[in-house]
Amino acid sequence: MNKFDIENLDLYYGENQALKAINLPIPVRQVTALIGPSGCGKSTLLRCLNRMNDLIEGVKITGKLAMDGEDIYGNVDVADLRIKVGMVFQKPNPFPMSIYENVAYGLRAQGIKDKKHIDEVVERSLRGAALWDEVKDRLKSHAFGLSGGQQQRLCIARTIAMEPDVILMDEPTSALDPIATHKIEELMEELKKNYTIVIVTHSMQQARRISDRTAFFLMGELVEHNDTQVIFSEPSDDRTRGYVNGDFG
């Protein structure tokens, strides 16, 4: 069963075509890794999944991108879409407020005022992001006092507090040390039990470790996609083989 079905998707920044006839199914409750050299279109595609590209002037998109069978570029509420499809960015970006308020922020923005309910969601979300035990005694402390890895997990907690269906991750560990990276990767194994995850990564080792499916992009084209084990051991295209073997990047 697929969470997203992408069919003949083209994207232009003005006259420049950044994505060319992309056809890609993204299965539900699995980790799909988007790989390829810089500028290949993988982050552009990621941002199509919650219409973040709408914020860029001069963008034009054609083709179909459906979530649960509904075209997300049709008559949909974009604000609701971005709740259902949360995003974690490359650099941790906690809000300039307490740990607690970071997680509660989205709930308050929706008009939720019940403190008991907010408390429950904050704890559940921090537990879901494997952060509760590290911060439960300092929830009122400023989020900027956390380490980089903790800040990134806080951003994940802030995302899952909104009860999304999908979590998009744009190189979420590129700014983290190996220990913090390992914790995020372990967390992803747990998160995929409840969420569909799509991750952009430059690390072949990371894609191999954490993803169920991998899609390889080159110069705006989707070269191939398959089970991750197949992409790394028996790719069908010589360009994929060259990339995963480190011949270019």
Curated annotation (Swiss-Prot):
Pfam families hit by this protein: ABC_tran
E.C. no: 7.3.2.1
Catalytically driven reaction(s): phosphate(out) + ATP + H2O = ADP + 2 phosphate(in) + H(+)
Biological process terms in GO annotation: phosphate ion transmembrane transport
Annotated InterPro entries: AAA+_ATPase, ABC_transporter-like_ATP-bd, ABC_transporter-like_CS, P-loop_NTPase, PstB-like
Domain of life, source organism: Bacteria
Record flagged with keyword Hydrolase: no
GO cellular-component term (any): plasma membrane
Primary subcellular site in the record, as a coarse category: membrane
Binding site for ATP: G36, P37, S38, G39, C40, G41, K42, S43
Family matches, as CDD domains: ABC_PstB_phosphate_transporter (cd03260)
Task performed by this protein: Part of the ABC transporter complex PstSACB involved in phosphate import. Responsible for energy coupling to the transport system.
Family the UniProt entry places it in: Belongs to the ABC transporter superfamily. Phosphate importer (TC 3.A.1.7) family.
Name of protein: Phosphate import ATP-binding protein PstB 2
Classification lineage: Bacteria, Pseudomonadati, Pseudomonadota, Gammaproteobacteria, Vibrionales
